[in-house]
Amino acid sequence: MCCGSDRLNQIVSSRSSLPISFEEDNNLVTNTDMNHLTVETEDTFASLLELAANNDVEGVRLSIERDPSCVDEAGLWYGRQKGSKAMVNDYRTPLMVAATYGSIDVIKLIVSLTDADVNRACGNDQTTALHCAASGGAVNAIQVVKLLLAAGADLNLLDAEGQRAGDVIVVPPKLEGVKLMLQELLSADGSSTAERNLRVVTNVPNRSSSPCHSPTGENGGSGSGSPLGSPFKLKSTEFKKEYPVDPSLPDIKNSIYATDEFRMYSFKVRPCSRAYSHDWTECPFVHPGENARRRDPRKFHYSCVPCPDFRKGACRRGDMCEYAHGVFECWLHPAQYRTRLCKDGTGCARRVCFFAHTPEELRPLYASTGSAVPSPRSNADYAAALSLLPGSPSGVSVMSPLSPSAAGNGMSHSNMAWPQPNVPALHLPGSNLQSSRLRSSLNARDIPTDEFNMLADYEQQQLLNEYSNALSRSGRMKSMPPSNLEDLFSAEGSSSPRFTDSALASAVFSPTHKSAVFNQFQQQQQQQQSMLSPINTSFSSPKSVDHSLFSGGGRMSPRNVVEPISPMSARVSMLAQCVKQQQQQQQQQQQQHQFRSLSSRELRTNSSPIVGSPVNNNTWSSKWGSSNGQPDWGMSSEALGKLRSSSSFDGDEPDVSWVQSLVKETPAEAKEKAATSSSGEHVMKQPNPVEPVMDHAGLEAWIEQMQLDQLVAQQN
């Protein structure tokens, strides 16, 4: 134990060392000789401080009985400086020394037998006994503090550095429980540590870095120390730095910065470009190290649920976590932003409020997810439904590749995760029907009588939609892969440089062009050694009409195919799968097709509409059945004989000689027929074509159809 006394034995020698005599009492004894002068001093106060440090109760009692006033005296004590590891000489009382080393018995003796001042401050640091007990690091410091508090110690007294006893607590590293108990005992207002500003002093190497001032001192001052001597602050005092008014900062409550789009996708997401110090709370952009930083919900797929690991301090997954990090990511998430009403209503004074202030500002909630973002699965089903309905007016991608959100982030996989919320809902009353024109096997007999007379209007609307959608589809086919067989053909047609809008129109309305394209397409398939399933090219049968009724107009079917220019290996393999599924129905479809073709021929003998013309379907449908509105599906024996002769495919060419005898062309009619077949647009623009011209065009289409049927039968 290191100690020192406040009164030292001083020996004055004039020339040489002489023997020194010590007296038993405390008086100064001077022996004077003619040649020598000796001064001897002795002090027992140093022994009292040492006795107090060693918890020697009997020695302290004897010293107090000998001189009761020595209890309140202060003497030099060599020990560790408070708040550091440096050893210095400073003035201490016996009670301070006993409190520093945890001498419980000596403290009880001093406070019980004498009138010692437990709140006395001395030394250069103006410390008290309670400061010494808190900073001494004794194992039994809790009992010492309780004794001093019971004796009347004031825990609000400040030392020379403006610190209370609770601000200078030092305990061994393994005694964290003692530290917490001391914090509870020495709290200024009796509350817990988490509810007040509390500093814990750590050991520092020198005095220059030790001063630490309380942030809430009685004098209202505050201090700071060096990084080595700065204490650990359990709760920081709220303090906002004042910045000069910056007119260049945008107003986050007005203009574009207050819109839902900016708040959800850009607020505290985009980095700030200002290189000078400014108020981050007034800036809508993110800064390095800012706690309000958000991940872009269009690039990082996370929910609005708070991350439990992030609440504890850090999330090991970082930006790849599927949960929200922080309040801003949670409440500014598109699934939760402004889905609830603010309790303050229109009187809300928050700079950035996460809630809606009026019912009109509420964002819609989706029943499938309970949030403001549609379900990813429901959107996938919606996209699949659109791909199955090529004629749907909404048959576009769920989120256009040209949208600002898709172009801004440069990531295609985020388009399905964050679709636009204004996509209309899809209602499919006939969802049990297969809408693909190559697979449906609907018959005209299945159509009710009251709907049969409306088929012409449906087909006219279908053809008009088909032409208009073909013009607008070329822009999106580049970025959207074909989803089915019909998309494959339409993609090839829209990407072909040799077809313009007029060519697409002629492909829709010209039977001659369709026949030529179909023949060329069959030749390419033969080169790939594959077989194409029978494609219905019957322009007069009700089957071509009921497709337009149930599948809707919009995309070009394989009957309207333009010339493909890309390699057909991948496409033919896909078509071969369709062929396997249709081979079982091939014979039945051919017979039904031939039957309807024969019925159409007999019908044209009496009334001569143009076969397959979209503009004259009213005439065709009105003359199909009897006058009472009921369709007449009967046929004569003569027609059956002609059917047998025309259905024989033993020869190289079909027997169509009886058709040649029905019509004799005049030179004028031949010219009109050539003009009609050369341009599909010319036929479309004639609301009431001349009857002979219509008849020739229909016969030509029927002949081409029969040739195609024969080619298909030969391949089978």
Swiss-Prot record:
One of its GO terms (biological process) is regulation of DNA-templated transcription. Residues 583-594 have a biased composition (Low complexity). Keywords: ANK repeat, DNA-binding, Metal-binding, Phosphoprotein, Repeat, Zinc, Zinc-finger. The keyword DNA-binding applies. It holds the Pfam family Ank_2. The modification Phosphoserine is found at S566. ANK repeats lie at residues 90-120, 125-157. Residues 203-213, 530-543, 605-630 have a biased composition (Polar residues). It comes from the Eukaryota. GO terms for molecular function: DNA binding; DNA-binding transcription factor activity; zinc ion binding. This is Zinc finger CCCH domain-containing protein 30. It comes from Arabidopsis thaliana.
